[in-house]
């Protein structure tokens, strides 16, 4: 997939600069900053004297009409660029299931269950709040159920540099599974008119794509047309086109071609993820935020009107209350009712902070919001304001909570390390330990000894 880059001499200035830029874009803080910048620019532009230019840009139509792909730029961002984002998310998901933490169900049980709780609880909170509103308000039940991987990991990268590595693994597993559920929700509940013929025809380019990869054919001139054809057929079927990104990702081999290959040799999946992640973080997600986050607030009165809409209240409550409630409650139940491993340097303070990070919906929530309510309507604008507000509140609360173990850890008197049997919870990893484990943590991970005979 990086054939053009391989054509450059290894020591060339262009290649060095390209590699440097790509490395910067792979950093989680960079992706989150670009995402936030796109959203801020959209909000400022939509509320400036040049707001008409923003609307004109979003509605500008481009694409081949004979393929029914004459779409607005906003639609291209939603259906096209987000497919790249979901392709990367699908690669991460498959990597975790095949070679990562999810390959062992016992280790993955807690974050997977937490993800399910983090979908059900905010949806339930939203439904409870909007049940008395108009009937169409319930169409947005899935908006607060999503987690923005890029934004959440970026916030964690900034505030959690002194946290155990297991914290990031737990969040990544939770967010990836959360996005998988969101993709299934989009495919099942937000497909209005299903065309069976193009949907069945999707199998042809998808299978060809998979066969080429199995044979280690990585020519961009062969793979890209097949990927674009798969995307176009999914789009024509009525299923949201982002699903194509996940389908393509799931057929990418996650293991080295031969068992005799050196264990350090990257798989095709790792190579694809390495090559395409900068495109997702540096282009796809920020441009989608630019195209989708802009909403005319209308001053203080407009803001009050938006935030008093039952739908907006339901979205904010779902993200800020429902998400943490679902994640924490299900995590507690699973760790108490099953024999999941304890220890791994995670405390309930960590879980509480991570549950707030999961409340950063943003990208996927904006997508579901556009699928739930017609663009340009007052309710759709209220949903946008609610998503931005709820995500920011969740991010701030997460930052405050996750700074607590940092301060406590620096003093060496974090109460959660004193009684590991009561405060530690299972996570998706058993591989990471703190650089300087406390005696309590060390004892908690030692097998029980039988009395000497």
Swiss-Prot record:
Single GO term (MF): sodium:proton antiporter activity
Membrane topology: Multi-pass membrane protein
Task of the protein: Na(+)/H(+) antiporter that extrudes sodium in exchange for external protons.
Biological process, per Gene Ontology: regulation of pH
Name under which the protein is recorded: Na(+)/H(+) antiporter NhaA 2
Keywords recorded for this protein, A-Z: Antiport, Cell membrane, Ion transport, Membrane, Sodium, Sodium transport, Transmembrane, Transmembrane helix, Transport
Record family assignment: Belongs to the NhaA Na(+)/H(+) (TC 2.A.33) antiporter family.
GO CC terms: plasma membrane
Membrane-spanning ranges: 32-52, 71-91, 109-129, 140-160, 169-189, 193-213, 232-252, 284-304, 310-330, 356-376, 382-402
Reaction equations catalysed: Na(+)(in) + 2 H(+)(out) = Na(+)(out) + 2 H(+)(in)
Compartments, as annotated in UniProt: Cell membrane
Annotated stretches, region: Disordered: 409-453
Disulphide bridges, residue numbers: none
């Amino acid at each position: 997939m990086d054939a053009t880059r391989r054509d450059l001499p290894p020591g060339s200035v262009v290649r060095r600069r390209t590699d440097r830029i790509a490395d910067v874009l792979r950093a989680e803080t960079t992706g989150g900053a670009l995402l936030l910048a796109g959203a801020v620019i959209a909000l400022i532009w939509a509320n400036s004297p040049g707001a008409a230019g923003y609307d004109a840009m979003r509605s500008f139509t481009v694409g081949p009409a004979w393929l029914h792909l004459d779409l607005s730029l906003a639609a291209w961002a939603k259906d096209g660029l987000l497919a790249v984002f979901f392709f990367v998310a699908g690669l991460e998901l498959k990597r975790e299931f095949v070679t990562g933490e999810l390959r062992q169900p016992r280790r993955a049980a807690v974050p997977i269950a937490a993800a399910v709780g983090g979908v059900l609880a905010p949806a339930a909170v939203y439904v409870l709040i909007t049940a008395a509103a108009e009937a169409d308000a319930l169409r947005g039940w899935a908006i607060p159920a999503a987690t923005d991987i890029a934004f959440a990991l970026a916030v964690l990268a900034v505030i959690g540099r002194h946290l155990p590595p297991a914290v990031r693994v737990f969040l990544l597993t939770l967010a990836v599974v959360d996005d998988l559920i969101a993709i299934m929700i989009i495919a099942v509940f937000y497909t209005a008119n299903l065309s069976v013929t193009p949907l069945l025809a999707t199998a042809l380019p998808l299978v060809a794509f998979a066969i080429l990869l199995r044979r280690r054919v990585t020519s961009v001139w062969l793979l890209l047309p097949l990927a674009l054809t798969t995307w176009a057929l999914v789009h024509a079927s009525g299923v949201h086109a982002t699903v194509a990104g996940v389908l393509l990702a799931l057929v990418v081999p996650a293991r080295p071609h031969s068992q005799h290959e050196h264990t350090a040799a990257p798989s095709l999946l790792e190579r694809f993820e390495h090559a395409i992640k900068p495109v997702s973080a540096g282009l796809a997600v920020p441009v989608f935020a630019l195209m989708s986050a802009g909403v005319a607030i209308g001053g203080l009165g407009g803001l009050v009107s938006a935030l008093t809409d039952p739908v907006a209240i339901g979205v904010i409550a779902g993200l800020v209350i429902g998400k943490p409630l679902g994640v924490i409650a299900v995590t507690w139940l699973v760790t108490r009712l099953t024999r999941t491993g304890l220890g791994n340097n995670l405390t309930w303070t960590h879980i509480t902070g991570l549950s707030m990070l999961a409340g950063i919906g943003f990208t996927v929530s904006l997508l579901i919001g556009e699928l739930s309510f017609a663009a340009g309507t007052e309710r759709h604008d209220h949903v946008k304001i609610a998503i931005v507000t709820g995500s920011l509140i969740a991010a701030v609360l997460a930052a405050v909570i996750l700074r607590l173990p940092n301060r406590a850890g620096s003093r060496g008197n974090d109460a959660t390390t004193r009684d590991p049997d009561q405060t530690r919870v299972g996570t998706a990893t058993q591989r990471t330990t703190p650089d300087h484990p406390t005696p309590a943590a060390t004892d908690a991970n030692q097998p029980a000894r039988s009395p000497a005979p």
